[in-house]
Amino acid sequence: MSTAAPRSRRHGRVRWWTYLMLSAATVACLFPLYWMFIVATTDTATATQMPPEVVPGGNFFALAGLVMETVPFVQALLNSLFVATAIGVGQAVLCALAGYAFAKLAFPGRNVLFLIVLLTMTVPTQLSVIPQYMIMSELGWVDTLQALVVPGLASAFGIFWMRQHITATISDELMQAARIDGANSWQVFWRIAFPIVRPAAFVLGLFGFVTAWNDFLWPFIVLKSPERYTAQIAIKALQNSYDVDLGLAMSGSFMATVPLVALFVLVGRRMVAGILEGAFKG
């Protein structure tokens, strides 16, 4: 026993080089955001000089005001918030519902349909732009926010994610017990299955939120009016056809990044816990 205790203490002790590696990784991850802020507080000449400037300047609020004057940036942030929130919530609920159906409900063609869902993950997103735009045009949704929300309410990856998680975490005996008590399929899902897989659905919703917030290609194609721009399209509108004002562009980019950083600070611990829970249970 005298030799086991020191050995366990040695294994439980964190080495100094572990902290060094974690600190280096943290600096590497945060440096792009810091550099973005530096450029957002200076002009293009200062941003491109050699050696580069490493101390923030004093022009951030002036450039931020210029961003607001150039494009309706606050409205763009609100549009992005609405679209990203709707897509995040929609994916969390609808993908969980579809994953539950593929995992626990028996119906003709279940395996074939799930295989088709998986095959759609192999199709590049760019190939769906033209038919998707044609559908939006027929519906009269071009230059509307629902053209961004509706196509993103479900995803093949989200359905696969939730199907695997539900298969691993919800037993058939639990569902049978609920059905014996008189619950129908919807009640089993909403009152039993969904509360159990809520952490995984929460993580999926966050992934959907971040993806929708950072999306550029589809909003750039379908949106025409400045008052309906999302944050990424508003940043593109800050650039003209001939040159790029780096300070102006980075000021808009920094203001569009701050909400994501704040979101991660608020829910980062819960997101990591949801990912680890799915990893251990799977």
Model-found features: residue ranges?
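Short, Lys/Arg-rich, polar N-terminal cytosolic tail immediately upstream
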Residues: 1-11
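A structural signal for multi-pass alpha-helical bundles of membrane permease subunits
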Residues: 14-282
